[in-house]
């Protein structure tokens, strides 16, 4: 995907046209992410006094900005004003979390109507008529809505919003720079907010008035303009950490001075009443009490979004350390926010072998450290959520989430103690157990109809998997010589695996599967692929006489290459069947893996009654590869999207297992018959 066009012609990643940027605010020196984004954008942070050709950088209208303005004026240096982008992080900057993008403005600052700005220039003069750009804008707007993403994201969509039908009045931080810029008269800001509240009541007789307090006011960091004195029978202060998207959905009207929530209200379909002069006022999408002069153009929501979110910001990809388009920032933020929402209460974990604990701590313990305990009472009383390794769960673990490896796991085997890139956490059951409904079952049902954006995303992901032969373990191997004819691939499995115990029928061993295939396809070329754990001598399932039933035993073979070389696949419950479906190879299931029973496979067993919809292969893939698993990038040490995980698997630039894990793995080969000790 190409990077979004920038309004700054000298902003480059390569640094071919660079500029010295003199700063007089310590934050430019201490905030590594800010420095890095500016560096990638072509700016060398410098100290001292500027010379000809140099520029001066200031942080918006911060308390230290006057220093830079004075130096710039004295030395005739251009000012570059820098701010956080409109999609920033989970927490505000005061928590130390780095931004995912910056607004680098060489003209003014977006919230000050007394100055021009690069954003206002875009809104005034850019054609904003490119069909591809508008399509990107609409897709990104939908993604932000679906994922409940905002500038700051320390809220949970499960927090219930108020009863709908209210008029939303947005409070802001007292003396906020955007308020000062919109109301430049000293002392007039409080009166403006009072006026806004009065208008909201007068223009909506009988309606409930909901004052949304600013998160930093709710947390006691900074005062707002409204407090308990403004509440009455009709007016309520609301400070619950609810999704802004849900809050706007229930509103019948929105009133704000200059809050970003006003911008989000426009994107949600509102025409908010504006009592300041923010960048989004004056373009025909708002009702302006004080219309900004010179804004005569009429824009659509998609045009405004394209300018403010795609063209104006400088976005950063923390996984690849590069500038990037908005879409990749949404990918990254969505993964980080999902981790915060699921992990913020902390986790107690049971039945986790020692070697798994460090990777799990990195995966799930970034917001609150995990605790590991085999005492169920301790786990229940911990005040944390509870997880158990799925195959080890018993009735004593009722109520715990079930944990398992995801479907794009690693370069190397789990049995060789290679840490996973992907894990699934299921509240109901687990994907390989067809005896009870799982979260994956629900997700597949929800994804029967994909939006065009979702379909494009998953199709692109699947095409990359196919092109680069990405599978669960990504083991290298050669393709053996295969006889001509109708080829049937039979993947072997670990015979004591939970998926066999729970998901197989009468055909529940590799030998029985081979015999069934030979009986059904007597003239076919039958290719048997042993499971890599079995090949490594780490798990049960070896067939001594496989050649009696198979024409080829493809040991150490590349599974993706095998799939591409056959006409069909027969399996009990192997994930290789799912990988074959992605490659449009027909699959016969004699068991009930998660992908059976939806009309995509030829099934020998009756499917569970809840598998009663007919998704397409892309719907199945979206649920299984995007919605269900979580991914973790060991290079950036951050939650990540499936696309980043695939990047890592393709490049192979993954940390190798530590020496202790390698030693344990070798020991396991000697103790394979005692696998319960280490699995």
Give residue spans per PLM region:
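N-terminal pre-catalytic "stem/leader" segment of glycosyltransferase-like enzymes
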Residues: 1-69, 175-176, 326-384, 390-397, ...
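A donor-sugar binding/catalytic signature common to diverse glycosyltransferases
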Residues: 62-68, 241-286, 387-400, 404, ...
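Segments forming glycine/polar-rich beta-alpha architectures that bind adenosine-containing cofactors
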Residues: 47-53, 57-70, 74-90, 147, ...
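Histidine-anchored nucleotide/phosphate-binding helix
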Residues: 35-38, 169, 182-203, 361, ...
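Short loop/turn segments at strand-loop or loop-helix junctions that form parts
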Residues: 83-85, 164-178, 213-214, 277, ...
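Structural alpha-helical scaffold elements that stabilize or flank donor/cofactor-binding regions
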Residues: 49, 246-247, 379, 481, ...
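Leloir-type glycosyltransferase catalytic cores
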Residues: 2-8, 14-15, 93-163, 284-357, ...
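Catalytic donor nucleotide-activated moiety binding site of glycosyltransferases and closely related
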Residues: 197-240, 514-556
């Amino acid at each position: 995907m190409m990077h979004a066009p920038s309004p700054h012609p000298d902003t480059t990643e390569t640094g071919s046209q660079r500029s010295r940027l003199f700063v007089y605010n310590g934050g430019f020196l201490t905030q590594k992410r800010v420095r890095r984004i500016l560096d990638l954008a072509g700016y060398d942070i410098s100290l001292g006094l500027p010379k000809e050709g140099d520029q001066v950088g200031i942080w918006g209208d911060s308390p230290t900005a006057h220093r830079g303005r004075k130096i710039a004026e004295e030395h005739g240096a251009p000012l570059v004003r820098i701010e956080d982008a409109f999609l920033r992080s989970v927490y505000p900057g005061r928590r130390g979390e780095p931004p995912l993008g910056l607004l680098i403005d060489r003209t003014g600052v977006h919230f000050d109507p007394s100055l021009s700005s690069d954003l206002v220039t875009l809104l005034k003069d850019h054609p904003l008529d490119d069909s591809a750009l508008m399509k990107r804008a609409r897709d990104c707007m939908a993604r932000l809505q679906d994922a409940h993403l905002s500038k700051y994201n320390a809220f949970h969509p499960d927090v219930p919003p108020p009863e709908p039908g209210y008029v939303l009045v947005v409070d802001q931080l007292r003396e906020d720079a955007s308020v000062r810029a919109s109301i430049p008269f000293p002392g007039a800001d409080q009166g403006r907010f009072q006026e806004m509240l009065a208008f909201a009541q007068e223009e909506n007789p009988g309606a409930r008035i909901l004052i949304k307090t600013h998160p930093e006011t709710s947390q006691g960091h900074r005062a707002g303009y409204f407090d308990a004195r403004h509440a009455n029978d009709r007016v309520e202060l609301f400070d619950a950490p609810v999704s802004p998207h849900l809050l706007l959905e229930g509103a019948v009207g929105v009133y704000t001075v200059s809050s970003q929530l006003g911008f989000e209200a426009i994107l949600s379909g509102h025409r908010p009443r504006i009592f300041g002069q923010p960048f989004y006022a004056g373009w025909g999408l708002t009702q302006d009490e004080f219309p900004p002069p010179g804004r005569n153009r009429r824009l659509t929501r998609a045009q405004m979004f394209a300018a403010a979110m795609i063209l104006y910001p400088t976005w950063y990809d923390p996984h690849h350390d590069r500038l990037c388009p908005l879409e990749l920032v949404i990918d990254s933020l969505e993964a980080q926010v999902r981790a915060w929402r699921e992990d913020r209460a902390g986790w107690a974990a049971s039945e986790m072998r020692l070697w798994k604990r460090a990777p799990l701590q990195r995966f799930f313990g970034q917001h609150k450290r995990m605790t590991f305990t085999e005492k169920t009472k301790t786990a229940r009383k911990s005040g944390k959520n509870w997880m158990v390794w799925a195959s080890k769960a018993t009735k004593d673990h009722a109520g715990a989430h079930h944990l398992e490896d995801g479907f794009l796991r690693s370069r190397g085997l789990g049995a060789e103690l290679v840490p996973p890139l992907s894990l699934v956490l299921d509240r109901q059951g687990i994907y390989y157990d067809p005896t009870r409904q799982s979260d994956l079952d629900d997700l597949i049902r929800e994804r029967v109809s994909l939006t065009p954006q979702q379909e494009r995303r998953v199709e692109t992901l699947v095409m990359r998997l196919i092109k680069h032969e990405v599978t669960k373990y990504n083991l290298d191997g050669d393709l053996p010589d295969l006889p001509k004819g109708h080829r049937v691939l039979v993947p072997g499995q670990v015979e004591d695996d939970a998926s066999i115990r729970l998901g197989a029928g009468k055909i529940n061993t590799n030998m029985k599967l081979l015999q069934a295939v030979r009986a059904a396809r007597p003239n076919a070329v039958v290719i048997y692929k042993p499971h890599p754990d079995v090949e490594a001598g780490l798990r049960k399932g070896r067939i001594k006489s496989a050649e009696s039933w198979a024409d080829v035993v493809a040991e150490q073979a590349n599974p993706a290459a095998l799939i591409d070389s056959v006409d069909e696949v027969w399996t009990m419950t192997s994930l290789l069947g799912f990988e074959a479906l992605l490659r449009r190879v027909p699959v016969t299931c004699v068991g009930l893996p998660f992908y059976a029973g939806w009309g995509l496979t030829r099934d020998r067993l009756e499917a569970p009654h809840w598998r009663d919809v007919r998704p397409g292969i892309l719907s199945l893939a979206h649920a299984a590869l995007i919605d269900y698993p979580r991914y973790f990038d060991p290079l950036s040490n951050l939650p990540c999207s499936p696309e980043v995980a695939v990047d890592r698997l393709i490049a192979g630039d993954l940390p190798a297992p530590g020496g202790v894990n390698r030693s344990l793995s070798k020991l396991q080969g000697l103790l394979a018959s005692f696998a319960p000790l280490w699995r």
